[in-house]
From Swiss-Prot:
GO terms for cellular component: cytosol. It comes from Staphylococcus epidermidis (strain ATCC 35984 / DSM 28319 / BCRC 17069 / CCUG 31568 / BM 3577 / RP62A). InterPro entries: PyrdxlP-dep_Trfase, PyrdxlP-dep_Trfase_major, PyrdxlP-dep_Trfase_small, Ser_HO-MeTrfase, Ser_HO-MeTrfase-like, Ser_HO-MeTrfase_PLP_BS, SHMT-like_dom. Its EC number is 2.1.2.1. The gene is glyA. Homodimer. This is Serine hydroxymethyltransferase. PANTHER family: SERINE HYDROXYMETHYLTRANSFERASE, SERINE HYDROXYMETHYLTRANSFERASE 1. Belongs to the SHMT family.
Length: 412
């Protein structure tokens, strides 16, 4: 960082302040995590200088012999992690990975079955403001109003009624185990292909703590950050029969040169995920989420679906204490807890207001937080939200946050 400080003090100061924010706050945004210093070093390496259009052994530029090595390592490690027949590590993001699959599997205007955004889906699963909802005809499935679990009978009914060409499983705010086998059975029944977006749960899948969609899906997409704890980026895993179409759709279809410094960082992260301690970490992520959920319930909050099976806890703050998700997010930010407002199933509030917040445990677990720490986190959340207009109580909450972050420093 000394070079940035000398060359561009304004940018240096902003980076330092962001580090201070990350170190002093408890990060509960479910899609965020902290990469290792090895991953960060790879991403900041000289590979950022190299252009390498094409794929290992088939490049349109010279001098690619070393980036061929790092990209090939990333591919082979991803195959080992997930048991995939083919892997493309070049997508710059999860959204671009999803776009590539749609371009391979669909024609403009084709019918797709995807999860309702407010029920836990993702923008790229058919939201009308997103390219997916503009280019394709998405039919939405959701959760049962009583138990807030995916209603597989509804999924089957909608699939039979609408005859989609593709069914999309996976979510960005669903806290329960997804039955990919059931989705595959429904897809086969109506002659549809199955795509699974496992961006949020990829780390849990890699550790064997969530069913692996690769066994069932034609296409699996993911980000490489979140629970996988790698650099920000995307990846596609598919059956060998789709290899050629997927690869040519990524390049030259929707991308030019791959980000080889990011791909090297992906390789390092995948190597870390192959180690035994990665499973221990993912086990702790789940234990922490369950401790967080249970303590919030004991504090009087309604947790969507009554609990969690993964890294994520969705909380109905509107139904619990008559507070919007927006105000809850702002209040928690004041005391040093970072989360995001989020719609919950059957939400009546606007998307920028919401009735809920989404909480996740991966980042704080990386810092070393255990169940007892997350019991304390839940109690701090309760203290802050129930006293959002009481400065004395908010200061107490802030001090308790500081005690935790001091105990578990980031990049010690």
């Amino acid at each position: 960082m000394s070079y940035i400080e000398k060359k561009d003090k304004v940018v240096y100061d902003a980076i330092q302040k962001e580090f201070q924010r990350q170190n002093s706050n408890i990060e509960l945004i479910a899609s965020e995590n902290f990469v290792s210093q090895a991953v960060m070093e790879a991403q900041g390496s000289v590979l950022t200088n190299k252009y390498a259009e094409g794929y290992p052994g088939r490049r349109y530029y010279g001098g690619c012999e070393h980036v061929d090595v790092t990209e090939s390592i990333a591919i082979e490690r991803a195959k080992a992690l997930f048991g995939a027949e083919h892997v493309n590590v070049q997508p710059h993001s999860g959204s671009q990975a999803n776009m590539a699959v749609y371009l391979v599997a669909l024609e403009m205007g084709d019918t797709v079955l995807g999860m309702n955004l407010s029920h836990g889906g993702h923008l790229t699963h058919g939201a009308t403001v997103n390219f997916s909802g503009k280019f394709y005809h998405f039919v939405e499935y959701g959760v049962d109003q009583e138990n807030e679990l995916i209603n597989y009978d509804e999924v089957r009914r909608l699939a039979i009624e609408h005859q989609p060409k593709l069914i999309v499983a996976g979510a960005s705010a669903y806290s329960r185990t997804i039955d990919f086998k059931k989705f595959k059975e429904i897809a086969d029944e109506v002659g549809a292909k199955l795509m699974v977006d496992m961006a949020h749960i990829a780390g849990l899948v890699a550790a064997g703590l969530h069913p692996n969609p690769v066994e069932y899906a034609d296409f699996v997409t993911t980000t490489t950050h979140k629970t996988l704890r790698g650099p920000r980026g995307g990846m596609i895993l598919c059956k060998e029969e789709y290899k050629k179409d997927i690869d040519k759709t990524i390049f030259p279809g929707i991308q030019g040169g791959p980000l080889e410094h990011v791909i090297a960082a992906k390789a390092v992260a995948f190597g870390e995920a192959l180690n035994d301690d990665f499973k221990d970490y993912q086990n702790q992520v789940i234990k922490n989420a369950q401790a967080l959920a249970q303590t919030l319930i004991e504090e009087g909050f309604r947790v969507v679906s009554g609990g969690t099976d993964n890294h994520l806890v969705a909380v109905d703050v509107k139904g619990s204490i008559n507070m919007t998700g927006k105000l809850a997010e702002e209040t928690l930010d004041k005391v040093g807890i970072t989360c995001n407002k989020n719609t919950i199933p059957f939400d009546k509030e606007k998307p920028f207001v919401t009735s809920g917040v989404r909480l996740g445990t991966p980042a704080a677990t990386t810092r070393g937080f255990d169940e007892s720490a997350f019991v304390e986190v839940a109690k701090i959340i309760s203290l802050a939200l129930n006293n959002y207009d009481n400065d004395t109580k908010l200061n107490e909450a802030k001090e308790r946050v500081h005690a935790l972050t001091s105990k578990y420093p980031l990049y010690n």
